[in-house]
Amino acid sequence: MRSLAPLVLASILAACSMKPPTGPVAGKAYFTQVGCASCHLIGGAGGAVGPDLTLVGFRHSPQWLDLWIKDPRAWNPVTTMPNKQLSPAAREAIVSYLAALKGQDWAQGARPWDGIADPVERGHKIYTRAGCIACHGAGGAGGYPNNNVAGGKIPALANASETFTKPELVAKIKRGVPHPVKADPNGPDPLVYMPSWGEVLSDEEISAAADYLLSLKPAGAGKSDW
């Protein structure tokens, strides 16, 4: 069946001919029309090339989303995400749509990791599908850019077992890092932060995520500053 997104977008444009459409409804139509869904999962639909976006509005601010969509390689020179050369109105609409995504697209009581009994495997699925991997990398390798932080990078988590006890790690995940330490105290706030996962994940889910991180034991990993 052909996607209805172009028809939805055409209807919105016709109804708002005096001004380009904005808001989450228009943003969802743009998101589909320009091909974002071919690489990104939202709920159970979409591709798996890029990060799952079901919780992206919880993980990132609208300000950062706008900067990222405007020019992905200006933020991360090695990203594979293309610059779609969107108009300001289309970008604004997509940002409003993404900023509203806070887990509601998962069916009630059904998350991707439900039914996985092994805590480490379950934690790995949470790490991937909740979006931790988008900032901390596959296997907790780190290296993702952030502004005005030490080294200009988000910390690796692959050495978490050398840095945290499990209770410490659970507490860290639960409260997040809403205000990362600035490299330059007089400079701007870092735009990428760790949200308080206790707001959207249960204690059991956070425990499983911690079990996964503590299972990672890289050779020669340095001390984390996370």
Language-model features, listed with the residues they occupy:
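N-terminal export/targeting leaders of redox proteins
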Residues: M1-A29, P88-A89, L98, S215-W226
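Electrostatic cytochrome c docking/interface patches
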Residues: A15-T32, K102-T128, G143, G222-W226
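Gly/Gly-Pro-rich "capping" loops immediately C-terminal to redox-active cysteine motifs
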Residues: P24-Y30, A37-K70, A74, P82, ...
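Solvent-exposed, polar/charged alpha-helical surfaces in well-ordered, non-transmembrane soluble domains
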Residues: A29, Q63, L67, E92, ...
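Short cysteine-rich clusters marking metal-coordination/redox-active sites
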Residues: C36, C132
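Protein kinase-like catalytic domain
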Residues: H40, L98-K102, H136, K174-V177, ...
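C-terminal capping alpha-helices of c-type cytochrome domains
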Residues: W64, K84-A110, P195-W226
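Substrate-binding/catalytic groove segments of enzymes
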Residues: N76, P167, P178-N186
